Regions:
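Beta-turn initiation residues at beta-strand->coil junctions
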Residues: 1, 15-20, 34-39, 54-59, ...
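Aromatic-rich beta-strand edge motifs centered on tyrosine
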Residues: 3-12, 22-31, 42-51, 62-70, ...
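Residue-level detector of conserved, well-ordered beta-strand and adjacent loop positions
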Residues: 8, 17, 26-28, 36, ...
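Phosphate-binding glycine-rich loops and adjacent basic patches that engage nucleotide phosphates
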Residues: 32-36, 48-55, 117-125
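Short, positively charged
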Residues: 41-56, 104, 109-112
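A motif-centric feature for acidic-aromatic and gly/ser/thr-rich catalytic loops and repeats
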Residues: 59-128, 134
């Protein structure tokens, strides 16, 4: 695996390229509001507490379901049906990603444990100022 990252003048990641596939992020302040990855396009909307609330994936809106700690535990379609479910251990290591859209939306949308951005390719969480390895609890 090869990975390259690009950061803006504020030190925030605006692009990652893994094995030749570029993912580009558009930021509003520190929040990712738009993302393209290969042929996928995602728009993100946030709640009053500045946590991810809605993702529009390739033109279709989905709602995030969060635990009290802010973990993204599910994604719902417009009818309230669960299309993706996530599970984590106590330190945020992914345990499962299931559902009818698990292999598409479930993998490409980045918000997971505590609402942090998860990189499927590296297994690391991007916390803006550092990366977090849930397998090592640091």
């Amino acid at each position: 695996m090869t990975a390259e990252f690009v950061y803006n003048a504020d030190g925030l990641r605006v692009q990652k390229t893994v094995n030749g596939v570029a993912t580009k992020y558009t930021l509003h302040g520190k929040n990712v509001v738009h993302m393209t990855s290969g042929t996928d396009e995602l728009h993100f909307f946030y709640d009053a507490q500045n946590r991810p609330a809605v993702v529009v994936y390739n033109g279709t809106a989905y709602a995030y379901v969060k635990s009290l700690q802010g973990d993204i535990v599910a994604i719902l379609d417009e009818n309230g049906n669960t299309v993706v479910s996530y599970g984590y251990d106590a330190w945020g290591a992914p345990l499962w990603c299931t559902g009818e859209l698990a292999e598409t939306l479930g993998k490409v949308q980045p918000f997971r444990y505590r609402g942090y951005v998860f990189d499927e390719e590296t297994g690391l969480y991007y916390l803006r100022s550092r990366y977090y390895n849930a397998e090592r609890s640091r």
